Amino acid sequence: MPGNQQKPESLETDSDTSPSCGLSDLSRGGSLESRCSSSRSRSFTMDDESLKHLTHEEKDVILFFEETLDSLEYDFDEPALCDSGIHCHSPQSLEESPSSHSEPEDVIDLVQPAPASGEAESLPDMPQVTGAPSDTKHGTPFLEGGKQAAENSLPPPDSRGPEVFPLPPSLPVPAPSAPRKELMSPSPPAEHPKLLRSVPTPLVIAQKISEKLAGNEALSPTSPSKEGRPGEWRTPTSPASRNGDHVGVWHRHTTQSAPKVHRFPSNISVTNSAGKDFNKTISKAAVNVQERKAQVLANINGMSFIAAGDTSSEERWQKAEEQRSGSADGARTLGRAGMAGEPGAPCAGVPARAQQSRAVQTEQPPALANGFQSVHEALRSEPSSFVPTSKTITFRPDPAVTGKLARQNASRSLYEPRPDGSQDARKRTGSLPRAVGFRPQGITVQFSGRGSTEEARREALRKLGLLKENL
């Protein structure tokens, strides 16, 4: 062929294109000469630069895309494409195309081998359907001539066989989509799915959309397709958008999901309130720890005060116990204090009335299950590791005894025995009951429902008789 002699040896795959371009130039006029020459020049430049390292198939695909782009530049005014010459021209159609240009049998011959290409979904089908009527060199009435030629080419059953019979009733289907002529023009060959690879998927989807738009304009909110005209979804789909079907079609519908957005900060506020309560419990626990440290020292010193013969503080202690007997927490803590105040051999100078009041108070709290404290109570009654310096607690005895007891408390808590403590203080601390598994007990004051203010602390300590009233 003379076309093969014009191309270099490096472009091996272009051997099929040159005869097709030559025959198409002979049959369809000189309008395609510039197009084939542009594709040749493009392929030559690519051959010199980038086609050296490409394979046989890659060169074929690149050339196919070049010719497709060349055909799209003319906007279907001169739609005889070289890609149809590459893949679709059988020798029978090549012989018939120069002889009979306007006959509908040429269209049938061009469309029938079209599925063999299979590389483009919608673009190869459009020139194959409209290839023969364009041979008359009319640029403007191309779409109308293509439709007439396609309708004329469908009825003869000799070349198509028995597959053509269900086609005539399906011809008026693409009528509603008049503005989509460039997509709907190859729709008649797209209607018979029995042909291999002859149904382009975008055309079927567009046809279904046009049918739904034509038949369901009034019932558009109930149609399952979301690709309808946006004007129909403005007013009637406000209830459907609440269900989440068409949310995001209009910005007006996205504002209806605002209650969900407002629920989320409410959840956050709930968790924040729970966190505040948790912080309150932490602060209460910290206050309880500080009060426990103060009360441990006050309890030990208070026992020594009772041993010293302070009967007025003992009377106030008894009155405070009677007032707080209704509270379960107060009864439990005072019961622990009473249990701690029951020695096997009572100290000298302790009145019998104080012993009786302590015995009464020990009967009020429920007895422990195993005779041991719970972990929580044991931790709360644990003595402090340092001597607290609280200003709200003042002690009645002289400073000498107070200093001795403070030093003794520090030595007991740090487990470092000091020999400078007096023998009386050691006898008093040794006379306290120490069961196996028990730690030295103290009074824990719980402020339930009250704040951690200074007045509440002083009032509680005043009720317990541990605070000097005339400060």
From Swiss-Prot:
Protein name from the UniProt record: Proline and serine-rich protein 2
Compositional bias segments (type: Basic and acidic residues): 313-324, 415-427
Species of provenance: Mus musculus (Mouse)
Region (Disordered): 1-46, 82-247, 310-365, 383-437
Pfam families found in the cross-reference section: SARG (PF15385)
Positions where Asymmetric dimethylarginine occurs in the chain: 263
Compositional bias ranges of the Pro residues kind: 154-177
Top-level lineage group: Eukaryota
